């Protein structure tokens, strides 16, 4: 068995609360989002893990979640690498719009296709496949080698950037991944084999709370 990979979706953001498409826009966490990140950190502290390095995105909601988790495991000063390769899916022209307003403008069916299809992007934005096309190579070059060397690695990122990782790690089809939602602040702990396959997966919390 090799190292450990922990994935955590950021806590609720201001724009999650306002029902806005966020993407690469940069709102901060809400009070609930802070509590969710702290709860995820406490779950990891209770689990007894100590990290060797952390990765997060270029966006403040993921960075703050990462820091709150590290604070909870008493590793506030741990080396943390920030990279936009881990950013949320870019919603393009939908970014900043209220989801109900978007449905009124383009129609409920079209917005549903943009949100939930695997390979149809919104205007000027990314599909889930596009998101995976930047997340997965970064994982292979920057994150996976650390895990395979035996390190314990934290990745605090976003719903869609993490779903694109989970799709490959869990061996999900594109139909299965479209039905998967990741709860905010709930850590997923992967133990990897030396050949990079998954030896075990534990979810430290209630993933049914995903939205």
From Swiss-Prot:
Metabolic or biological pathway, per its Swiss-Prot or TrEMBL entry: Carbohydrate degradation; glycolysis; pyruvate from D-glyceraldehyde 3-phosphate: step 3/5
Q: Which GO terms describe its molecular function?
A: phosphoglycerate mutase activity
Reaction equation(s) it catalyzes: (2R)-2-phosphoglycerate = (2R)-3-phosphoglycerate
SUPFAM superfamilies attached here?
Phosphoglycerate mutase-like
Record site feature (Transition state stabilizer), residues: 158
Binding site residues for substrate: 9-16, 22-23, 61, 88-91, 99, 115-116, 159-160
Q: What is its EC number?
A: 5.4.2.11
Which Gene3D superfamilies does its entry note?
Phosphoglycerate mutase-like (3.40.50.1240)
InterPro entries associated with the record: His_Pase_superF_clade-1, His_PPase_superfam, PG/BPGM_mutase_AS, Phosphogly_mut1
Q: Where is the active site?
A: 10, 88
Instruction: Give the EC class as a word.
Output: isomerase
Which keywords label this protein?
A: Gluconeogenesis, Glycolysis, Isomerase
Question: What are its GO biological-process terms?
Answer: gluconeogenesis; glycolytic process
A Pfam family annotated for this chain is: His_Phos_1
Physiological role: Catalyzes the interconversion of 2-phosphoglycerate and 3-phosphoglycerate.
What is the protein's quaternary organization? Homodimer.
* Family from the record: Belongs to the phosphoglycerate mutase family. BPG-dependent PGAM subfamily.
What is this protein's record name? 2,3-bisphosphoglycerate-dependent phosphoglycerate mutase
The lineage, from the top, is: Bacteria, Pseudomonadati, Pseudomonadota, Alphaproteobacteria, Hyphomicrobiales
């Amino acid at each position: 068995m090799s190292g450990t990979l922990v994935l955590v979706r950021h806590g609720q953001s201001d724009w999650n609360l306002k029902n806005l498409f966020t993407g690469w826009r940069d709102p901060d966490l809400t009070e609930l989002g802070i509590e969710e990140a702290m709860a995820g950190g406490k779950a990891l502290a209770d689990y007894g893990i100590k990290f060797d390095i952390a990765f997060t995105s270029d966006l403040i909601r993921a960075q703050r979640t990462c820091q709150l988790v590290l604070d909870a495991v008493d590793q506030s000063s741990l080396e943390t690498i920030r990279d936009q390769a881990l950013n949320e899916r870019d919603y393009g022209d939908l970014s900043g719009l209220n989801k109900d307003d978007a449905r009124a403008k383009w129609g409920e069916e079209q917005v549903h296709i943009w949100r939930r299809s695997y390979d149809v992007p919104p205007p000027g934005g990314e599909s889930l496949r596009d998101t995976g096309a930047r997340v997965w190579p970064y994982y292979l070059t920057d994150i996976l080698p650390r895990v395979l060397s035996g390190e314990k690695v934290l990745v605090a990122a976003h719903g869609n950037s993490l779903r694109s990782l989970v799709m490959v790690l869990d061996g999900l089809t594109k139909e299965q991944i479209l039905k998967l939602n990741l709860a905010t602040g709930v850590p997923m702990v992967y133990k990897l084999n030396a050949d990079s396959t998954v030896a075990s997966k534990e979810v430290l919390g209630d993933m049914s709370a995903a939205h």
